Amino acid sequence: MKICIFGAGAIGGHLAPRLQNAGADVSVVARGEHLAAIQKDGLTLELPDRVLNARVKASEDPGELGKQDAVIVAVKAPALPDVAARIAPLLRSDTPVVFAMNGIPWWYFHANGGPFDGRRLPLLDPDDALWHAIGPQRSLGGVVYSSNTVVRPGVV
């Protein structure tokens, strides 16, 4: 299964080595010194009982990573407009997108059946960029139950 982690910081950097260790074909969208370190030495996850190193394909350009079976977005909320603008090359018509991040999801009221059914949240998706680029029908929320930090570029 091809899985791309969009945002290889503390959360994405924790998930990528674990998914690769489980047999997934993992790639990451990263930037700066973190990207350079991942491209050179792989992405290292330091756990209390072991160290996992994932030699993942890493790029700042999602177009270099190809279509994916699943995408996990693990960025901070202010980076979501950038995700909306750049995620298209990763998506097939049926690619699910999991949001592993803090806060209320931008698609929260989509098809919930309650009094706010279908209501959009302009503070979270001001120009409907995520709504149009990804769509609520393929969006999933995720919970990451671990404490993570980037120790140094390429190491979580």
Each model region followed by its residue ranges:
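NAD(P)+-binding Rossmann beta1-loop-alpha1 motif at the extreme N-terminus of oxidoreductases
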Residues: 1-47
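Rossmann-like NAD(P)(H) cofactor-binding subdomain of soluble oxidoreductases
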Residues: 52-55, 59-152
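A contiguous, well-structured "functional interface" segment within a domain
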Residues: 2-6, 14-18, 141-156
